Amino acid sequence: MARPTVFITRKVHYEALSLIGEECDIDLWEQDKPPPHQLLCNRANNVDGIMTNVMDRIDVEFLDVAANLKVISQIAVGLDNIDLVEATRRKIPVGYTPGVVSEVTADHTMGILLASAHRLAESERWVRNGQWKIAFHPLFWLGSEVHHSTLGIIGMGRIGSEVAKRAHAFDMKILYNSPARKPLI
């Protein structure tokens, strides 16, 4: 019996490739840019599974030529690029990775918050340009205090909740908008 073939539209971690390769033949798109839609469609008729990214359009045109497709796996949280109604109609299961970037996105959010409040990008450019050698007012570079400040969060889903957890470490007052009250906030 032939092994199933999976088309992977992005470079993924070696360990993931190794695991998939134990059970399947892999057709890997190795370029940094997303594969063109026509290329996806051209390869669709020879694969049993596809591992996609949000930049790959999995639409009726693709599904029409993907006669052997048994599964779609999205390496992302969102599914806007996949025609879920059509995949469901054809009984092709679609997997995705909910929550996979919630914590790192919250970390990044706090990093941007701190960098903005303390004018880190401006300060870095200022030092690189040698401007630290001239007279300046030192309070200018202190920026705004994050500790004990108030933070507004629009949407208290996975990412918003993770941001709130981090904000608590700074004793920040949290104001948020969400369809449901979050008792832990």
Where does each model-flagged region fall?
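Short gly/ser/thr-rich secondary-structure transition/capping motifs
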Residues: E30-P35, N53-V54, N129-L139, L184-I185
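N-terminal glycine-/charge-rich "phosphate-binding" loop or analogous flexible N-terminal tail
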Residues: M1-V47
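Short, polar loop motifs at secondary-structure junctions
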Residues: R10-E15, M55, S178-P183
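Phosphate-coordination loops involved in phosphoryl transfer and adenosine-cofactor binding
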Residues: R3, L69, H147-T150
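Structural detector of well-ordered beta-strand residues that form the stable sheet scaffold
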Residues: F7, D27, V71-S73, P93-G95, ...
